[in-house]
């Protein structure tokens, strides 16, 4: 399908504005690309609840787990450049990882949330990278790797960051800046420089409301000792949304949940992936790496979310039994949402890159109507 920028904007803009009028959006931005070209951007609202700071072209915002998609892209590029297949064992490159019965865990299992490492037995702080890595190394899988999958909310970023460090000799944050962000002028950071805090929108927690679906997940999330509670609180710390508005925490390289940037940057990155791995006259990914992004590795009931989810090599896909598509109608679409409403993906079949970011979170584990109505309208 070929999108026409003018007619698409006429269809999308009223829905975008309706997010503020009907759905309680505070500030937000949207960016849609096709075939490596930007079709249009939209932005509106405010960076703060006092409504004193308008959301402008240079506003950036925390996107929580949408950062995982960026991190996964960096890992897959690292594997591509070093000719490493994802069926290789993690312990080949990270020997201490093999402790606790993990010697045969593959990269594919690790990046598809099926390694059974979503929670840690050792009580370590999320800000202490080395302590978290040591705890990961000692951790025994919580289920037989490859037999099931469950969302690795916090540990995922540490797992892929350490593997990139072992193979490429640098952190994902630095790899991202060098390989993608600087060459493509992408306004997205994993570890925000202090001088950019003045451009940041404040992120606000979801308003108190009756728990939305999946009800069982939300009930288990607040129950001590459950897998859900352990997953979202280990490694521990920075569980309050407000903590991530502090400059010292924005500066931390949290690959699982700390990325800060613009909708335009996210959409352009996914537009590159959707466009055969190339954009602006540069090619970043070959066919083999792109196939890893579109090919489902794990699909079915997620042990953490307790609903069907699916993952390729680090990217989320629509589950076969999902109640609603998150990434449009194409089976080849992939991406990663963020807590509360941010959403970004690539549709390689139609060469589309999409991103929606916001600062007023909603109580939802997956993208909500504010972004999904826009996705649906894009394919009318």
Which ranges hold each PLM region?
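Active-site Gly/Thr loop motif
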Residues: 202-258, 263, 291, 295-349
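Short, charged, amphipathic alpha-helices and their helix-cap/turn boundaries
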Residues: 42, 124-145, 170-187, 239-242
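Active-site-proximal alpha-helical segments within enzyme catalytic domains
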Residues: 112-113, 156-163, 253, 257-279, ...
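Short, conserved catalytic-motif segment at the N-terminal edge
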Residues: 2-63, 83-88, 134
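Short, gly/Ser/Thr-rich active-site loops of penicillin-recognizing serine hydrolases
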Residues: 254, 275, 289, 294-301, ...
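Alpha-helical scaffold elements that line and support the substrate/ligand-binding pocket
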Residues: 36-37, 62-84, 110, 152-180, ...
